[in-house]
Amino acid sequence: MTNIRKTHPLIKIINHSFIDLPAPSNISAWWNFGSLLGICLIIQILTGLFLAMHYTSDTMTAFSSVTHICRDVNYGWLIRYMHANGASMFFICLFLHVGRGLYYGSYTYFETWNIGVILLFAVMATAFMGYVLPWGQMSFWGATVITNLLSAIPYIGTTLVEWIWGGFSVDKATLTRFFAFHFILPFIITALVMVHLLFLHETGSNNPSGLISDSDKIPFHPYYTIKDILGALLLILILMILVLFSPDLLGDPDNYTPANPLNTPPHIKPEWYFLFAYAILRSIPNKLGGVLALVLSILILMLFPILHMSKQRSMMFRPLSQCMFWILVADLFTLTWIGGQPVEYPFIIIGQLASILYFMIILVILPAISLFENKLLKW
């Protein structure tokens, strides 16, 4: 009798994806973040579902309903803070996952990579709309500022913004539709994740050396299942430390003030995971230019397969590229810091320099260094 695991139409798919999947024998802990992102997505969908049972998407009651969840619902505070901080963990894992892809040249699987970039956009859109739902000051003004950016689009801008708002300002219609989109997007993300995995399993995983590893594969289970479980335990440990000891560490105190269209907060800023893009947006004095730079700061990831000039796939044996990669990481930290600072000297000029450096490293310096390293191979 053949194993049901290998014959049953549905279980067979799971078997080929998570059990008998041939995986490189040398993939490091940097390859754990895919599974961690899956766990983050599951946590977010489950906690979000339970929050949606008690939340009301109406301007009059939204803020009160969140307070009600935290005070009156059994373990409501836990569900709410797991959802809020789960988003932060999601983005930490996302940034590390993308960084791993850049460092080890995983972007040469360009279908997998491009679906990944679309996923990044989808998660960012979901997180932005989720931030609006508690209807605090920063929710309202964040929504106003970010949606307003679309008015920079020539000809259709103003009409587009009013269409998204469902009126002439961010109001009840906006909140209701943001809740609807925030609910549906994670399921679209789940479908995209399946496509992401489908393309990945067509080629198999990359590995730290960047070399073809077909001659040295091991089964995913038990080797990488146990490794992923360790990663998951560490993720949940960090998340629960954050949730139970300092749940508001990454939030904005302004969001504990109900939304007031007549009172603008002194510093409007998004959640920490958008600050790098926000800094790039603010560093350009022109509105349309800023919006383009904001979109390109993420969209530029799609250019990496084209900009790859090196004869080697991974950066493992390319010290000059490694050095530039870590300068890029430091630059992103700088942009994140600048995004949270007021628009005044010296932060403006630092932000502008960091933004220029960001695009320069990706578009010019890294490809140039790769070509130079190719020359070094001949010496």
Swiss-Prot record:
A single MF term (Gene Ontology): ubiquinol-cytochrome-c reductase activity
Positions bound to heme b b566: H97, H196
Binding site for a ubiquinone: H201
Localization, UniProt: Mitochondrion inner membrane
GO term, biological process aspect, one: mitochondrial electron transport, ubiquinol to cytochrome c
UniProt cofactor(s): heme b
Protein keywords: Electron transport, Heme, Iron, Membrane, Metal-binding, Mitochondrion, Mitochondrion inner membrane, Respiratory chain, Transmembrane, Transmembrane helix, Transport, Ubiquinone
Residues that, per the record, bind heme b b562: H83, H182
Major subcellular site: mitochondrion
Transmembrane segments: 33-53, 77-98, 113-133, 178-198, 226-246, 288-308, 320-340, 347-367
Domain of life of the source: Eukaryota
Membrane disposition: Multi-pass membrane protein
InterPro entries attached to this UniProt entry: Cyt_b/b6_C, Cyt_b/b6_C_sf, Cyt_b/b6_N, Cytb/b6-like_sf, Cytochrome_b, Cytochrome_b_C_euk/bac, Cytochrome_b_N_euk/bac, Di-haem_cyt_TM
Pfam families according to UniProt: Cytochrom_B_C, Cytochrome_B
Misc remark: Heme 1 (or BL or b562) is low-potential and absorbs at about 562 nm, and heme 2 (or BH or b566) is high-potential and absorbs at about 566 nm.
Primary role: Component of the ubiquinol-cytochrome c reductase complex (complex III or cytochrome b-c1 complex) that is part of the mitochondrial respiratory chain. The b-c1 complex mediates electron transfer from ubiquinol to cytochrome c. Contributes to the generation of a proton gradient across the mitochondrial membrane that is then used for ATP synthesis.
Homology family: Belongs to the cytochrome b family.
Protein name per the record: Cytochrome b
Species the sequence originates in: Tamias amoenus
Gene: MT-CYB
